[in-house]
Amino acid sequence: VLVLAKICVRYQYLLPVNVKFIFQPAEENGQGTQIMLDAGVMENPHVDQFLMFHYVNDAPMGMELHRGASTAAIGSVQIEIKGKAAHWSSSERGIDSIYAAAKIIEAAHELNQTYQSKWPFIVGIGMIQGGKAKNVVAEDTVLQGTLRSCDLKDYQNLRELFLKKISEIETETNTVIQVEIDEEPIPPIINDDSMVDLGLKVGDEIWGEDSRLVTQLYLSGDSAAYYFRYAKGLFLVFTAEKKG
């Protein structure tokens, strides 16, 4: 992208439009896009069309793009479980927060197996921290994870089902559970149809058969999806597999 920016600057007198390059900060925590939008990145000059580039090295040389959604809606999951500490020699006096955590993890796996959808989705717990000593019933346990879906309706359905199951586990285990699952997730990136058509045309001219319109959806996501609310956009993936 830096090379492309250099070329555009060098030959800007040949370009019939203004070209603005955006290098996004804070990508991993999902905050970068809003920072840029608040700073007026889509104005001065006003942005009418938006291209987003991504590079991967696990597919043959070429270009891939989707029609419609190309990434997933992504929400964070934070679960705090409060039990009651007790020595394991008198465990009946305690309330085991790790046991409740285990049931929540099992519920997430069950939801992944039983929820029916034509779109990819996942409910995943990636972090667990609980207990203070090996001989003490764990009073506090914290779970962190992610909820991802390529369909916003599925996202909301999965969120409600998971919250309902966690509430049942709270009653069953006599714990107190606080749950935060983003009600408004980072949205999926939705490619503009006219931009897809243009991308395919240019891709055919440059890449030929190595320009691919793909249908497989991935559960990756990016807060750059918010840019697509301000201008017609296209998310392009350039592939450059290194063989050997």
Name each model-derived stretch:
Residues 99-244:
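Metal-dependent amide/peptide-bond hydrolase catalytic core
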Residues 2-4, 8-127, 131-138, 222-224:
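Histidine/acidic-residue-rich, glycine-tolerant segments that coordinate divalent metal ions
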